[in-house]
């Protein structure tokens, strides 16, 4: 059979992940130091693991309600009000298999063929392909290093057309670590209030901000909750990536439609993970603070080390990534990262994997031990010196 003729054109056109390529290459190098994975190096807090174990011992292994356990949805509402001044009821919450499923459901529920979806770049890799699979048209906005990769109101205003349906608002940002201040979020909201454009606010890194830059959800601002779907989850803040649990909150009519799609393709999120997540929301504020403090220590070290060796790097205020310029090499970001991997066995991700505006940069995760980071920084410095790009 000619499977190429049978496959859906939109699915065939999907590009493979530029991140996965480097994971696969690094897997064959036993001494490779990887700074590529966007995953906490901490274990899930014991109280959360214990809650999952207890749920299994009690025989809680059946499906839950499609939207998720009622107790978990209540706890999510309480948590969002306590932490981010967001006010929701159970009917506004859908528990999903990770934040990525919530993003997929939101885009599929909202976007029709020909609708434009504004996506600030550089950005997480899933927004564009999901939009394209629905027949939507991605409209990219290239954020700039001089703005610390934050979306500006002027950029947004210029990108909106009569066909614009949705803005993806991914802050704190992967891959840049950019955080929007309260004033900057309000400027974006002011533009949107003049339109019928909806917002998909990806807030998976909302607990991971540093210094005075506490995360401000755009849905907390006047007139914005009614047009915003907030996506969040447990993977990053609670070190629960393998538990595969996220959620979406938003206007009940939108969440209801997303739940119908979720019911058809997933049924319900993992039951054990949901019981564990209730404990995470109840008991893990101290563990979040501990992990955040440690990320902050690593962040300061990596930013200082990169700048000292000549890889210009602004100070990110969120997530657990830095996004240094590699332009002193004269190489593309893919060439730079491939050479570094081959010659020094250090895996980082080319900025171009996160969109065209990421060219000339690379993403480095600091979700690793300080010893791991120090070894990687030493190898990167040696790599730069051996090629004559720096003299230090």
What role is predicted for each listed range?
Residues 63-97:
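Conserved N-terminal alpha-helix of the aminotransferase class I/II PLP-enzyme fold
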Residues 59-63, 291:
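A short acidic, glycine-rich active-site loop
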Residues 1-14, 23-29, 33, 37-55, ...:
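PLP-dependent class I/II
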């Amino acid at each position: 059979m000619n499977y190429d003729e049978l496959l859906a054109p939109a699915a065939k056109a999907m590009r493979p992940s530029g991140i996965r390529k480097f994971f696969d290459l690094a897997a064959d190098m036993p001494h490779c130091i990887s700074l590529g994975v966007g995953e906490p190096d901490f274990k899930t807090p014991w109280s959360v693991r214990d809650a999952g174990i207890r749920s299994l011992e009690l025989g809680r292994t059946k499906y839950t309600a499609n939207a998720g356990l009622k107790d978990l949805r209540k706890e999510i509402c309480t948590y969002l009000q306590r932490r981010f001044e967001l006010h929701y009821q159970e009917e506004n919450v859908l528990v999903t298999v990770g934040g990525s499923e919530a993003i997929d459901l939101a885009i599929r529920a909202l976007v029709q063929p020909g609708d434009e979806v504004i996506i600030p770049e550089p950005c997480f890799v899933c927004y564009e392909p999901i939009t394209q699979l629905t027949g939507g048209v991605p409209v990219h906005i290239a954020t700039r290093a001089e703005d610390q990769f934050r979306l500006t109101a002027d950029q947004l205003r210029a990108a909106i057309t009569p066909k614009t349906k949705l803005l993806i608002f991914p802050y704190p940002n992967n891959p840049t670590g950019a955080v929007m201040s309260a004033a900057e979020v309000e400027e974006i909201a002011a533009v949107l209030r003049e339109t019928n454009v909806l917002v998909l606010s990806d807030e998976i890194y909302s607990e991971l901000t540093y210094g005075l830059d506490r995360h401000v959800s755009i849905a907390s601002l006047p007139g914005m909750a009614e047009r915003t779907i907030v996506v969040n989850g447990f993977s990053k803040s609670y070190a629960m990536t393998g538990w595969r649990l996220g959620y979406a909150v938003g206007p009940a009519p939108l969440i209801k439609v997303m739940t119908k799609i979720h019911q058809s393709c997933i049924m319900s999120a993992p039951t054990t993970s949901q019981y564990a997540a209730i404990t995470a929301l109840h008991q893990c504020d101290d563990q979040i603070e501990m992990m955040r403090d440690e990320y902050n220590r690593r962040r300061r070290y990596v930013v200082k080390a990169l700048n000292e060796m000549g890889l210009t790097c602004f100070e990110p205020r969120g997530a657990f990534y830095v996004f240094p310029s590699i332009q002193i090499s004269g190489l593309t970001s893919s060439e730079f990262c491939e050479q570094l991997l081959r010659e020094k066995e250090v895996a980082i991700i080319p900025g171009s994997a996160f969109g065209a505006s990421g060219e000339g940069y690379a993403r480095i995760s600091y979700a690793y031990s300080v010893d791991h980071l120090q070894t990687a920084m030493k190898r990167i410095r040696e790599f730069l010196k051996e090629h004559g790009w720096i003299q230090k």
